[in-house]
């Protein structure tokens, strides 16, 4: 059961990473969702 859970988590992580790579580069704050900011062409979560 733990092996299946780990496999699913890894699959989700890979899917998210692939999705982030395919997203076009952002140019300003309005292109990112709430809680994120545009930095170096990518929407990154705001820390702090």
From Swiss-Prot:
Disulfide bonds join 26-38, 32-43. It comes from Haemadipsa sylvestris. Residues 1-21 form the signal peptide. It comes from the Eukaryota. Its main location: secreted. Residues 22-27 form a propeptide. Does not show effect on voltage-gated calcium channels, potassium channels, and tetrodotoxin-sensitive sodium channels. Does not show activity on Nav1.7/SCN9A, and shows very weak activity on cation channel TRPA1. It is found in: Secreted. Expressed in salivary glands. Highly expressed in the head, body and tail with a 2-3-fold higher expression in the head. GO terms for cellular component: extracellular region. Leech salivary gland peptide with unknown function. Keywords: Amidation, Disulfide bond, Secreted, Signal. This is Peptide HSTX-VIII. The keyword NADP does not apply. The modification Leucine amide is found at residue 47. Belongs to the annelide toxin family.
């Amino acid at each position: 059961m733990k092996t299946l859970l780990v496999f699913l988590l890894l699959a989700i992580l890979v899917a998210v990473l692939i999705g982030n790579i395919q997203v076009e580069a952002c140019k300003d704050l309005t292109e990112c969702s709430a809680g994120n900011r545009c930095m170096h062409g990518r929407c990154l979560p705001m820390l702090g």
